[in-house]
Structures are given as structure tokens and as C-alpha cells.
Regions:
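Low-complexity, intrinsically disordered terminal/linker segments enriched in charged
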Residues: 117-132
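Hydrophobic pocket/interface hotspot
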Residues: 14, 26-27, 34, 49, ...
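Short beta-strand segments enriched in hydrophobic/aromatic residues
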Residues: 30-31, 89-91, 106, 122
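Short, cysteine-centered beta-strand-loop-beta hairpins and adjacent loop/turn segments enriched
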Residues: 62-63, 90-99
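Short, low-complexity N-terminal intrinsically disordered segments enriched in polar/charged residues
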Residues: 1-28, 32, 132
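A short hydrophobic beta-strand element
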Residues: 79-89
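Short, surface-exposed coil-to-beta transition loops
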Residues: 68-69, 100-105
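A solvent-exposed, acidic/Ser-Thr-rich amphipathic alpha-helical stretch
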Residues: 4, 25-78
Length: 132
């Protein structure tokens, strides 16, 4: 048995940390030189390295949201390092009471128990509208 967490387990830790809004441990899920791209963000964004990810995840603590991940489906691929995860963040803006559902598809490569690259296809506009 491998001493490293599986891609599926690492993904689960990621969405658990995001939905609980506990950002402190999230950067440690990533390799030092990890690259995360958000192709559907306006403008598209690219985060390189743990420091950039730490800054990105720190925003979770200030967001006025309660949310959960639902309809989670993780697909294994022919490459044992790569998974495709489909899911939704569903929640509520605690300041406005506005409900939201944000569909996501993450294509994630996990090597030695850490995310080395991820393409996160999220409906950023739906989240931005919920925060307005």
C-alpha cells in the first residue's frame, strides 16, 4: 500500500477544507511548484506555487457564505495520477440570504500525495452574483 494519499482522497480533503472555510491546511495539499488555472474566471487566472495558493485560500475566511459540496462524482482516468471531479458548491450568502449553486469540474493531477496541477472549471459568474 502506498504511503501517499490517493488523488481521490486529496480531492476530498480539498473540498472539505473549502466548504468548512478552513484555509490553513489547504496549501499543504499542493506541491511547492503546483500550478492551478481557472480558465472560466474573468479574466482567466493562473496560480503558481504554494504562496499564491495560500493567498487565494485566505479569502475563504472573510466570505459571508455557508456552503457544502454536493453531487460529487470522481472519475478515474487511464493515468493513475489524474482524476476528473464533477461537483457543485451549494450554499447561501449569510449577509443577503441569497442561495447559490456553483457547478465545477476539476481536472487534477496528484503525485506523491500532493496536487501538482489542476484545471478548475467553475461557474465563477454564479458565485460572483451570489456574493453581490
Amino acid at each position: 500500500m502506498s504511503e501517499f494519499a490517493t488523488p481521490r482522497a486529496v480531492f476530498q480533503r480539498l473540498i472539505d477544507g473549502v466548504t468548512s472555510r478552513r484555509p490553513d491546511g489547504l496549501p499543504q495539499l499542493y506541491a511547492e511548484d503546483a500550478v492551478v488555472v481557472h480558465p472560466f474566471a474573468r479574466p482567466a487566472s493562473r496560480l503558481e506555487g504554494r504562496d499564491a495558493l495560500r493567498e487565494h485560500f485566505a479569502q475563504l475566511e472573510t466570505l459571508p457564505v455557508e456552503m457544502a459540496a454536493r453531487n460529487v462524482v470522481v472519475h478515474q482516468t487511464a493515468d493513475p495520477e489524474v482524476i476528473v471531479a464533477e461537483f457543485e458548491y451549494a450554499g447561501r450568502n449569510t449577509e443577503t440570504g441569497r442561495d447559490f449553486v456553483v457547478p465545477n469540474v476539476f481536472v487534477m493531477r496528484v503525485r506523491d500525495g500532493r496536487i501538482v496541477e489542476s484545471r478548475d472549471y467553475a461557474h465563477h459568474q454564479a458565485f460572483e452574483e451570489a456574493m453581490a
